[in-house]
Amino acid sequence: ANYGTILVTIADADKPRALPLIRRFYNLGFNIEATSGTTRFLRENGIRTRCLHKLSEGSTEIFESLHKGHVNYVINTIDINQHSARLDGYDIRRAAVENNVTIFTALETVSVLLDVLEEITLGVSTIDAEQNV
């Protein structure tokens, strides 16, 4: 099953924590799109990723992708110390809102979403499994 596409841009500090979550989306059959730094990180870790360049890199690819309507979720954690990342993050979040795309800025929330998607897809309820022990 293919659920669609997630667009990911993750602050460096969050990348190790984000990796297993993004891998779960990938294993569920989502297409992964990401900004250049995140793309490089994901590819190094064996996740096929389509690179979209940022507005600060002179590109409107992210907005075109969101506007086309094939992106289901945006995951955007920002490095508050990096001015360009803050601005890009703001632009991405605004574009997501304008195109009615669900946006996550906290990895904890993403984890909850994945639990639900996996339960629907794989038909495995971890809650039931724990109760039967």
Functional labels for PLM-detected ranges:
Residues 1-104, 110-113, 122-133:
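ATP-dependent carboxylate/acyl-activation modules
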Residues 117-118:
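Histidine/acidic-residue-rich catalytic or RNA/ligand-binding cores of hydrolases
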